[in-house]
Amino acid sequence: MRQRSFTHEVSQPHHGSSRSSSPHVNQTYALTALTHRNLTTQRFTFIAMSQHIYINGEYFSKDDAKISVYDHGLLYGDGVFEGMRAYGGKVFRLEQHLIRLWESALSTGLKIPTTSEALTADVNECVKKNALEEGYIRLIVTRGAGALGLDPYKCDNPQIICIADKITLYPDDLYQNGLELITAATIRNHPAALSPRVKSLNYLNNILAKMEGLKAGCVEALMLNHKGEVAECTGDNIFIVKNGLLMTPPVEAGILEGITRNAVLELADEMGIEAIEAALTRHDIYTADECFLTGSAAEVIAAVKLDDREIGEGKPGAITKQLNEAFRILVRQ
């Protein structure tokens, strides 16, 4: 098991061009941008759609929030996004989310037509306009409308969309008792093809693995990388505890470097819990004392089984509970 101690550096956001003039959305656009399936079997369920949806500087009701059917975000999943949480009306680590958004855009050659400062103000305004005290924010940047071909240089007017809404996470009993995982046959994207560090609108890789989990009766599934090492779950990062040592796969394993993941590593350091990034296998999870997942929507939740094998005592462990409690305090500071 290769390992290295945890270090994390936050880069500065890359600023785009000055903020656009927020043109009116063409009323002939035929696609309702923000329709959602009933996710009752998914990791979380949207309770009610946002009544004030932000698109390029303007607000629309959910029924009137539309983008072009020629938008490459729809046609090819060409765009980037961030999923964030609000606690007490304040977005948790918004700056870090925007840094990651800009890095995803830079990696895919997508120019965000605003600045990080302006977008910070827009996200906060959207949260306030929707009176969202506790909930979820989805921030999306599409490539914009173009031709039916792949050529991204024929696209113009990237769409910036922000939804602020309430969500229901996993059922309370899963937070109390932990959830079960299976290992998906679908492996994580090879970093040489598409970096998992890019939070792309194309989530088919994750969706296929998610379907495997759901068909097996599990709400989450573990994804391995092309080397057979543990990467992450379909929507969350994964941690294990062995003999008091906290371990999580490194970025090089092909993971999305989660904002919640990094917050938990920082908390562990503050609490005197030794934490490392280490290349892990399923054997390491099978033989771990504890296991838990982290994510903006999931927060911190224990995993008590993998592939029908109990992890540890088959219930949330002491370190998992300590970090969960510390995280819930952190997000409301």
List the predicted regions and their residue ranges.
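Glycine- and Gly-Pro-enriched alpha-helical subdomains that act as flexible
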Residues: 222, 229-251
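Basic polycationic patches enriched in arginine
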Residues: 2-4, 13, 19, 37, ...
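Short, Lys/Arg-enriched N-terminal segments with co-localized hydrophobic residues
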Residues: 28-48
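Conserved alpha/beta cores of soluble small-molecule-handling proteins
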Residues: 46-222, 226-229, 252, 256, ...
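Short, low-complexity interaction segments enriched in Ser/Thr/Pro/Gly
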Residues: 6-9, 23, 35, 42, ...
